[in-house]
A protein has these predicted regions:
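Alpha-helix initiation and N-capping motif
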Residues: 9, 70, 141-145
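Short, Gly/Pro- and small/polar-rich lid/capping loops
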Residues: 1-26
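Glycine-rich, N-terminal phosphate-binding loop and its surrounding beta-alpha-beta segment
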Residues: 21-104
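Non-transmembrane, interaction-prone segments in cytosolic or luminal domains
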Residues: 2-6, 55-57, 96, 147-148
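Glycine/serine-rich phosphate-binding loop and adjoining beta1-alpha1 elements at the start
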Residues: 60, 82-166
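Residue-level marker of positions within ordered structural domains that often coincide
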Residues: 3, 78, 153
Length: 166
């Protein structure tokens, strides 16, 4: 992207090359069979110079495993920065993922909700209307975004905050 935009300044290129923050979390989820299963999730926040981070949360199980997923999430958060900048939307780039394929693994609705709320709890300190605004992505919908909003709101004084998600 720096080449296309003809950004020559070496320090600026280095600054834009990596996310500001990548949060890696472990999410314990009580499964329907009573056992606890650990999931790994990420939230990459690439750049917020133009406004709050913005980007999807996906359920994702790449063949390369968790390490590949982390790099993918970092790259996708970068793309969100550039997409918002190109169309002059005052938002930065973010992206999140949980290492799971709910279709292949046939997780129940309850298991998915506990997973989503657990992830929201773990990333709550870095998201919010003025910080980072998650959105649906692969295998997530408005249903999961509502669960994230509800969890975040309960952790922030029970204030109704629809602006925490899109």
């Amino acid at each position: 992207a720096c080449d296309i935009l003809k950004i020559k300044d070496k320090q600026l290129r280095e600054y834009l090359a990596m996310p500001n923050r990548v949060l890696r979390v472990k999410i314990p989820v009580k499964m329907d069979n009573g056992k606890i299963r650990m999931f790994t999730g990420f939230r990459s926040q690439h750049n917020n110079d133009r406004g709050p981070y913005k980007g999807g949360i996906r359920y994702f199980d790449p063949e390369g495993g968790v390490k590949y997923m982390e790099r993918e999430v970092m790259a996708l958060s970068s793309w969100m920065t550039w997409k918002c900048a190109i169309v002059d939307i005052p938002l930065g780039g973010g992206k999140g993922a949980i290492f799971v394929n709910p279709k292949k693994e046939k997780l129940s609705d309850g298991e998915l909700e506990r997973l989503t709320r657990g992830f929201a709890y773990k990333i709550a300190e870095v998201i919010g209307p003025q910080k980072d605004i998650p959105a649906p992505d692969v295998y997530t919908t408005g249903k999961e975004m509502t669960q994230i909003m509800d969890t975040w709101s309960k952790m922030n004084g029970n204030r109704y905050s629809p602006g925490v998600i899109t």
